[in-house]
């Protein structure tokens, strides 16, 4: 066995690793521990619903939203009608993923679940942002989520320490 190739193979494998970034417009950005999501104004949960839907920076309904464009839903435990007042929620976990809606029609659902905690007792569960596409599409980035949420919500990410 030729041992000359071990350093070369090691270098190639290490270069495949993606670095964590602090830029929410990049696909490699992950919402860091210690982040928060601020609700900036009253959010209305409709009658007989446990969520509010947002798209293009505005409240919408499940019937009116375009599943092929990025949309978000803010989920709570109890049924509306209900008004959620401005509050800062702690983000305790995020999950990014994709799943087949229809393999025959080649439709994928790209999603990010942002699990939330309230210090004020609000019965919040999570914020889910999602869009449908096909296998030639890419997942969305956090900055696109911010645009979809408009002025209703704001993410705050903790300051990161510079690399030493």
Where are these regions (language model features)?
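C-terminal motif of bacterial Sec signal peptides marking the signal peptidase cleavage site
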Residues: 13-15
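Short, conserved beta-turn/loop elements at beta-strand boundaries and strand-helix junctions
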Residues: 93-103
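Bacterial signal peptide processing site
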Residues: 17-20
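Post-signal-peptide N-terminal segment of Sec-exported extracytoplasmic proteins
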Residues: 35-64
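C-terminal partner/receptor-binding element of secreted or periplasmic proteins
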Residues: 121-164
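Sec-dependent signal peptide recognition
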Residues: 2-9
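N-terminal post-signal-peptidase region of extra-cytosolic proteins
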Residues: 67-79
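Short coil-to-beta-strand transition motifs
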Residues: 77-92
């Amino acid at each position: 066995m030729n041992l000359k190739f071990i350093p070369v193979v090691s270098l190639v494998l290490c270069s495949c690793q993606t670095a964590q970034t602090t830029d929410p417009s990049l696909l490699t950005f992950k919402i860091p521990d210690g982040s928060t999501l601020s609700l900036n104004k009253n959010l209305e949960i409709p009658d007989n619903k446990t969520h509010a839907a947002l798209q293009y920076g505005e409240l919408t309904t499940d019937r009116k939203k375009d599943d092929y464009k990025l949309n978000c839903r803010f989920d709570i435990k109890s049924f509306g009608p209900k008004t959620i007042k401005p509050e800062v929620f702690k983000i305790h976990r995020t999950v990014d993923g994709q799943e087949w809606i229809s393999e025959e029609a080649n439709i994928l659902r790209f999603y990010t679940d942002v699990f939330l905690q309230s210090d004020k007792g609000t019965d919040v569960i999570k914020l889910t942002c999602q869009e449908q596409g096909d296998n030639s599409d890419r997942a969305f980035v956090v900055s696109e989520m911010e645009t979809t949420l408009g002025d209703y919500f704001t993410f705050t990410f903790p300051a990161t320490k510079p690399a030493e």
